[in-house]
Amino acid sequence: MMSTRWDERHGRILGDICSRFNEIGIRYFIIRNFEGLPNNNPSKDVDIMVDTKHTKEAKAILLSIYRAHGISNYYEARHGFVHCCHGVDVDNNFAIKIDLIFSYISKGFEIFTFDELYEHSENYNEFRVLNNYFEGVMVFIYKQFNYSPRLKDEYKEIIYNTHKSYPGFSNLLRDLVGDYLAEDILASIESRRFDDMLLLSNKLTKALRKFAFAKRPLKTISLVAAFYITKGSKVIFRYKKYSKSFSVIAPDGSGKTTFLEKLLEEIDFFFVNDKSDNRCHVYHFRPNLLPNLGAIGENVGIKEQDKNFTNPHRSKPAGGLSSFVRISYYWLDYVLGYNLYVRQDVQFDRFSVFDRYSYDLIADPARTRLDLPLWVRKLFVKLMPHPKVVFYLDADPAVVFGRKQELQLDEIARQQIVYRALAETHDRFFSLDANRPAEKSANEALQVILDKFTKRL
C-alpha cells in the first residue's frame, strides 16, 4: 500500500495540467526525469519550470486539476520561487507532488532567465522538456552553487557525459566563471576526479555570483535582499505558523514505538518523501539541546551514568532542591531547544516529532526523579513550548502490562488517569484507542495531521 509513487493516475493529472498550460499559452518545460512520462516516472515527483509572468494562472490550473481528479487535501511548501505542491487522496492511498518553479534563483542569484532556459527545451511526447545538454548544465551548477555540494553517482555521470557529448559545455563554463577556473574544473571532470571538482565549489559559487551580479546588478541586489528577508521572517519571526510539530504520549508499553513507525511511514508516503529526505525529525522526550544530567555528572566525576533504561523507575526520587534544579534544567532545554531545533525543521520543511514530551513531568515524575508538588510541575510544563498536536495512546492497563512489564499494573492505571485528564485540557490533544492494531491508530492520526497541516480542496 505504501510503495506506489507514480502510475497512470499521476500521468493523467500531469497530462491535464500541461495540456491546460498549452491551451492558454503558458510556456513551461519539465526539468529532468521525463523519460517514460506520462505514465512512468523514475523519480517520485515532477519539476515544472513555468514562465514567471503566469505564476497565479499556473497555480490556479494545478489546483483545479487536483480537484477534478479527486484530490482531497493540498499542502504547499515554498522555497523561494519553488512551490512544492502536494496532493493527497487518503481514501485511495494516493499522493502526488509536482514542483512549480517560477525562476531558477539560488539565494537571490539568477544565472539563467526563464527565456534563456526555454531556448534549450524541446518536445517529448505531449510535453515540453529541457534538453539533455542543458539538463547537464543545470545539474552541474545547481548541485554545487550556494550550497554544500553532494553528488550522487547519477549526477556525476550526467556531468561527465555532458562534458564529453556537448562541446558547448566547455565554452559556456568559460563564459560563466572565467578561463582559469573553468580549465581546473574541466580537467577534474575529464579525469572523473569529482572530489577534486567539489573542492572548487566555493570558487565556483563566487564566480557565479559575480556573473549574476554583473548581468543584472540592481535585480540581483533586490533578489538577495528579498531572499534573506523572507527567510528571516519565516524561520525567526513566524516559525510557529509554519511548524509541523506533534508528540505522542502514553505509559510505557502502550505501543508508542510501533505506532510512530507506522505513522511516519504513512507521512513519508502521503507527503511523497523518501526516508533519506529526513522530513521527519524525531526527538525523544525533549529537544536535547542540553546534555543529560547523568552524562554531566559522569563527565565531572560525580558518579557513573546509569544506562539501565529497561526500568524507567530504577532510581529514587531526588530531594526537593535537586528536583527543582532538574525541572528548571528541563524547562530551559525545552525553551531553548524547541525554539532552535523547530526553527531548523521549519527551514527544511520537516515534521518535528516528539516521542514523549514534557507532559511526562506531570504524569510520570518518577521517570525523571522529580519529587515536587503537582502544581509546580504543571506550572513548569505550562511555561514550556507545546507541539501543535498531541496524540495520547489510550489502552486497557492489562493490555499495556501484557506488552511490556516495565511498570506495575497499578502504576500504569495511575498514569492513564493523569494522561486522560491532560487530554481534556486542550484541543491539541487527541486520544487514540491503542487496544487495536497500530495501523488503525496510525490511520486515524494521519487524518488528524492532514486536517491540521493541509488544506481541504
Regions found by a protein language model. Give the residues of each.
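Conserved NTP-donor binding/palm subdomain of two-metal-ion nucleotidyltransferases/polymerases, i.e.
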Residues: 2-46, 50-244
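P-loop (Walker A) phosphate-binding loop of NTP-binding proteins
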Residues: 251
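Conserved lysine of the Walker
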Residues: 256
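Hydrophobic positions on the alpha1 helix immediately C-terminal to the Walker A/P-loop
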Residues: 259
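A glycine- and Lys/Arg-enriched "phosphate-lid" helix/loop adjacent to the NTP-binding pocket
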Residues: 356-421, 430, 434-435
